[in-house]
């Protein structure tokens, strides 16, 4: 299961959730179907350990495919095992994985296109966010049903910003010059040691976000033509890297960042060790549970044109070619990702949070209908958390994703390694991205070789 829910912990609310959820599966009636399922549904990559959202959705989906049995060993997707399964023609019926895998395995012919599944089970694809669907669509066919939906906004420590004379208007990624000034106002050091990061651009992970903000599309819509060394992409990397170099340089910057108690009560916001940085939405849950009284807010990430943007990633369900129980797999995917299932488990969690005195900070999925219903501030919730939910929910509407590609892994490796070479001073942004472009072109050419 996604780290977002493991991160916020099963801690004190675990017992409450269990008590509330006892009748959840029995009460849920939205997944009625006419097909009678049988045999065993074998799933790879989905676990429920310590995760109430996963457990409750699992129970609902399990009921939907009954009397078929469900075999889902805890643990994430194992690519080496999956390759072995494909070679031996003993594939699981369903895989749960990062959406970046979908294009690669669809191109290999290892996945079933879901056209007939979507039609026979009447799966409403309009409920899923377009950015999520784009990342599971290859050569005109859908090969995955999207699940979670990462939303990246700027997390701002308002205490650090206020005491440094930095306003929200200055923390505007649409204005690189002013943003850098704000970063340096919040940055602190003692000699060569960094003691506070003013602004962390989150490299290499968020390079696609910076590239998009500067006007670059680093991969074509069909996933076949990389454009990693465009002037816009080079400018984006040059700027984002300059933020780190201006704050002590990469080694000192990274050394300090590695000291953060990221998931604990002494996290970098609670200890005022960072001014602002782009981050996925699940981290607000971490803050709300570990340090609910921190001074924090959310600001949209904006392109140089001033428009809000979000680089979305997330998980998906896919059916391998040769699956023996594809009918049950299709029903499982539909049930796990439909709006009524999300609403049921969200309400269970909300009730548990309320009983435990914890603040609700949202559950963000690839299902826009579900999110509209569940991501509303609860009564009595502090304004800062309510504001954060609203900001994240709004950001979902401005999302883009990297298209499905036959060489997604190699493409991601190419740009990640390029950014790392720049951070470590081994190459200039132009040199690094020129090399990455050659590597990506070669990888896609090899992957599409007949």
Regions found by a protein language model. Name each.
Residues 2-104, 119-126, 305, 340-344, ...:
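Conserved N-terminal structural module of periplasmic/extracytoplasmic solute-binding proteins
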Residues 80-91, 108, 160-161, 180-189, ...:
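Short helices/loops that flank or line small-molecule/ion binding pockets
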Residues 206-209, 214, 237-335:
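Extracytoplasmic/periplasmic substrate-binding proteins
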Residues 283-293, 306-312, 318-413:
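C-terminal lobe and pocket-closing loops
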Residues 73-82, 100, 174-178, 254-267, ...:
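Short helix-initiation/N-cap motifs at beta->coil->alpha
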Residues 100-152, 178-182, 297-299, 382-383:
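Hinge/lid segment of periplasmic solute-binding proteins
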Residues 118-119, 137-206, 216-254, 321-327, ...:
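Helix-loop-helix "hinge/cap" segment bordering the ligand-binding cleft or interdomain interface
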Residues 64-74, 90-91, 165-171, 221-225, ...:
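A local structural motif
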């Amino acid at each position: 299961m996604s780290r977002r829910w493991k991160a916020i912990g099963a801690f004190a609310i675990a017992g409450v959730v269990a008590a509330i959820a006892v009748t959840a599966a029995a009460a849920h009636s939205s997944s009625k179907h006419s097909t009678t399922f049988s045999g065993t549904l074998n799933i790879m990559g989905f676990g429920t350990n310590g995760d109430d959202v996963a457990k409750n959705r699992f129970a609902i989906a399990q009921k939907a495919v009954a009397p078929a049995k469900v075999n889902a060993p805890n643990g994430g997707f194992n690519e080496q095992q999956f390759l072995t399964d494909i070679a031996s023609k003993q594939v699981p019926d369903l895989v749960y994985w990062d959406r970046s895998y979908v294009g690669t395995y669809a191109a290999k012919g290892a996945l079933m296109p879901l056209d007939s599944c979507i039609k026979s089970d009447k799966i409403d694809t309009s409920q899923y966010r377009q950015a999520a669907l784009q990342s599971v669509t290859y050569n005109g066919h859908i090969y995955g049903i999207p699940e979670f939906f990462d939303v990246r906004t700027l997390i701002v420590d308002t205490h650090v910003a206020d005491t440094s004379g930095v306003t929200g208007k200055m923390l505007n990624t649409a204005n690189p010059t002013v943003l850098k000034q704000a970063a340096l106002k919040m940055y602190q050091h003692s000699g060569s040691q960094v003691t506070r990061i003013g602004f962390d651009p989150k490299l290499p992970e968020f390079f696609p976000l910076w590239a998009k903000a500067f006007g670059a599309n680093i991969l074509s819509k069909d996933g076949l033509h990389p454009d990693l060394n465009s002037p816009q992409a080079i400018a984006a990397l040059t700027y984002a890297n300059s933020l780190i170099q201006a704050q002590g340089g990469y080694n000192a910057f990274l050394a300090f960042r590695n000291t953060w108690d990221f998931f604990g009560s002494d996290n970098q916001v609670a200890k005022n060790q960072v001014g602002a940085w782009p981050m996925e939405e699940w981290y607000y849950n971490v803050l709300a549970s570990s340090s609910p009284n921190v001074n924090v807010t959310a600001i949209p990430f904006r392109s140089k044109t001033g428009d809000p943007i979000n680089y979305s990633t997330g998980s998906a369900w896919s059916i391998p070619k040769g699956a023996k129980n594809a009918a049950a797999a299709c029903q499982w995917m539909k049930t796990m990702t439909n709006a009524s299932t999300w609403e049921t488990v969200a309400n269970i969690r909300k009730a548990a949070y309320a009983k435990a005195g914890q603040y609700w900070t949202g559950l963000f999925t690839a299902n826009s209908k579900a999110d509209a219903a569940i991501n509303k501030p609860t009564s009595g919730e502090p304004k800062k958390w309510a504001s954060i939910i609203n900001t994240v929910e709004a950001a979902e509407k401005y999302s883009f994703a990297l298209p499905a590609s036959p060489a997604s892994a190699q493409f991601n490796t190419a740009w990640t390694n390029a950014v790392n070479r720049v951070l470590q001073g081994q190459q200039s942004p132009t040199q690094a991205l020129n090399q990455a472009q050659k590597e990506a072109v070669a990888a896609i050419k090899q992957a599409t070789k007949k």
